[in-house]
Amino acid sequence: MSAEARKTETIPEWKQEEIDELVAFLERYESVGVVDITGIPSRQLQDMRRDLHGTAALRVSRNTLMERALNEGGDGLGELVEHVEGQVGLIGTNDNPFGLYQQLEESKTPAPINAGEVAPNDIVIPEGDTGVDPGPFVGDLQQVGANARIEGGSIKVVEDSTVLSAGEEVSSDLSNVLSELGIEPKEVGLDLRGVSSEGVLFSPEELDIDVESYRTDIESAASAARNLSVNAEYPTARTAPSMLAKAAGEAKSVGLSAAVESPDLADDLVSKADAQVRALAAQIDDEEALPEELQDVEQPAAADSAAEADDEDDTGNVEQTDESDADDADDADDADDADEEDGDGGDALGDMFG
């Protein structure tokens, strides 16, 4: 008989049943952690169990039995054994480890601190009226290091007073003063020591992240990757629609610049031509320079956009277009002078633009 078998036989039946129940508990959840329950009163612990109901479950047992269950659980749960020390419990959830950590941190509540406990952070008595009538309490405040005095029939703390630094032990006098003032300097809750999910062990430090900042970083990275894919003309399922739209826009711009006759470009070409006619007429010092059929017609809104699109995609031809327009304007002036001599300038312009 193997040593393991003999060892199993020596375990009392009730212990083996407890281990089996713990193993079954571990197998029900995707994420399993070890939490510190030191100093939590039984009533508050029950309240925490109730608050966790529906999202997580807490199981407390003997440390030796929890260690055995973790070693038998597999999937990397054995790595949690090193955290089973002191007053601890097992917590299971189907949420991810980050969600579990956030839930436990948000569930913590303020609590008074007792004499002999170590301050988790600096303890500060804030400036203000204590609401306590004049009496020996002012001396108690001063004794623990608070700057207090009697003013207006009440005991007041005249400035924020740090009465104990983090890591120092709380004295009986300070505990009584804090209790009298209703100051609760510590938080009571389940402290996560470690959590295992899909064979990966996470420490509390790794789980303590700013979710919103992390989400913003991910969104920025995804946006940058998408832009890089589009600009590098690397098609993917996400970038293909944008690349097709970009290609269609560029093809349309080329068609407008080259005046390619196409049903898809007809409206834009007409608007572009209208804009050019109006621009040319505006340079001629003659109210009748614009053909009569266009004088009472408002310029189409699409004309501006078509002209702008043409300018953006064909900047190399801007100077040539300006020179051409100027030459056309000079020709129009010469024609205007000749028509004035003949007395039929309007008909000549009509022939020019008709």
Swiss-Prot record:
Keywords: Ribonucleoprotein, Ribosomal protein, RNA-binding, rRNA-binding. One of its GO terms (biological process) is cytoplasmic translation. This is Large ribosomal subunit protein uL10. Part of the 50S ribosomal subunit. Forms part of the ribosomal stalk which helps the ribosome interact with GTP-bound translation factors. Forms a heptameric L10(L12)2(L12)2(L12)2 complex, where L10 forms an elongated spine to which the L12 dimers bind in a sequential fashion. One of its GO terms (molecular function) is large ribosomal subunit rRNA binding. Forms part of the ribosomal stalk, playing a central role in the interaction of the ribosome with GTP-bound translation factors. The gene is rpl10. It comes from Natronomonas pharaonis (strain ATCC 35678 / DSM 2160 / CIP 103997 / JCM 8858 / NBRC 14720 / NCIMB 2260 / Gabara) (Halobacterium pharaonis). InterPro entries: Ribosomal_protein_uL10, Ribosomal_uL10, Ribosomal_uL10-like_insert, Ribosomal_uL10-like_insert_sf, Ribosomal_uL10-like_sf, Ribosomal_uL10_arc.
